[in-house]
């Protein structure tokens, strides 16, 4: 098939535009010139500029509304119409990460919660003003109970970070020597021991444990005396024959007692 030159492609382009019209009247669509492109882009710029002005006006309106509500000691947002007297939502306050400032707080919220719900909840229950809220939805992690079962996904976790008016600094954690209940060494070792015992299958059955510094086992196998293979087989056969003879003798004794009881 011969290759199309630039002039041939320009000649075929209006024909392709005509076929693309469909079942309507075949009407040739002219190719746009460079001037029309520049003109349309200038219109888009003008339109985006007007939209930006509208956004600025809305943001200024929200800012003034929020400022007036804070100065008057009222809500800095529009309160919802549905009244909830006994909220069942569980809100968990988390410790801040290294990227968080003292003016930020992070919560775990239900997946049905949105930003407006958290803002309303914190203000009416704790009197805390949430100025800006960001949402983060963590994917469910894969987990399994043990190696025999199939893996499954844990539920997703939804977190929200708010910005506050005043800073809040978490108190320092007490040292284990100050508060024995704050020492998590024993629970962590118990969890590690449980995981090791559940996963000790096959070649890992005799693997030494690491929980509690290996005191509770499983222990490493000690050196065993060398026994030749043929001698080990001979000893095992004698042991099995002796066990079979004892089992046969027990059955004969039981049968003899049963016959004596009948007479």
UniProtKB/Swiss-Prot annotation:
Its gene name is MRP20
> Extra notes?
Present with 2200 molecules/cell in log phase SD medium.
Q: Identify one Pfam family in the record.
A: Ribosomal_L23
Q: InterPro entries annotated for this entry?
A: Nucleotide-bd_a/b_plait_sf, Ribosomal_uL23-like, Ribosomal_uL23/eL15/eS24_sf
Q: Which family does it belong to?
A: Belongs to the universal ribosomal protein uL23 family.
Q: Where is the protein situated, by its record's location annotation?
A: Mitochondrion
Gene Ontology terms, MF aspect: structural constituent of ribosome
Swiss-Prot/TrEMBL keywords: Mitochondrion, Ribonucleoprotein, Ribosomal protein, Transit peptide
Question: Where does the transit peptide start and end?
Answer: 1-45
Q: What is this protein called?
A: Large ribosomal subunit protein uL23m
């Amino acid at each position: 098939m011969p290759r199309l030159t630039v002039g041939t492609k320009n000649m075929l382009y209006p024909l392709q535009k005509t076929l693309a019209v469909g079942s309507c009247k075949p009407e040739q669509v002219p190719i746009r010139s460079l001037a029309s492109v520049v003109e349309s882009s200038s219109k888009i710029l003008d339109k985006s500029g007007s939209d930006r002005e509208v956004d600025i006006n809305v943001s200024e309106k929200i800012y003034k509304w929020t400022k007036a509500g804070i100065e008057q000691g009222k809500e800095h947002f529009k309160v919802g119409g549905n009244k909830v007297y006994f909220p069942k939502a569980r809100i968990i306050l988390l410790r801040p990460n290294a990227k968080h400032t003292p003016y930020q707080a992070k919560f775990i919220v239900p997946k049905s919660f949105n930003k407006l719900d958290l803002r309303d909840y914190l203000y009416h229950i704790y009197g805390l003003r949430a100025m800006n809220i960001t949402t983060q939805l963590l994917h469910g992690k894969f987990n399994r109970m043990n190696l025999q079962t199939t893996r499954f996904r844990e539920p997703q976790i939804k977190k929200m970070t708010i910005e506050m008016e005043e800073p809040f600094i978490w108190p320092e954690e007490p040292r284990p020597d100050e508060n024995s209940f704050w020492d998590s060494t024993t629970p962590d070792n118990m969890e590690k021991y449980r995981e090791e015992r559940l996963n000790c299958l096959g070649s890992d059955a005799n693997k030494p444990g690491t929980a509690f510094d290996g005191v509770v086992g499983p222990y490493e196998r000690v050196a065993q005396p060398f026994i030749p293979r043929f001698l080990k087989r001979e000893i095992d056969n004698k042991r099995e024959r002796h066990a079979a003879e004892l089992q046969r003798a027990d059955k004969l004794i039981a049968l003899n007692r049963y016959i004596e009881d009948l007479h």
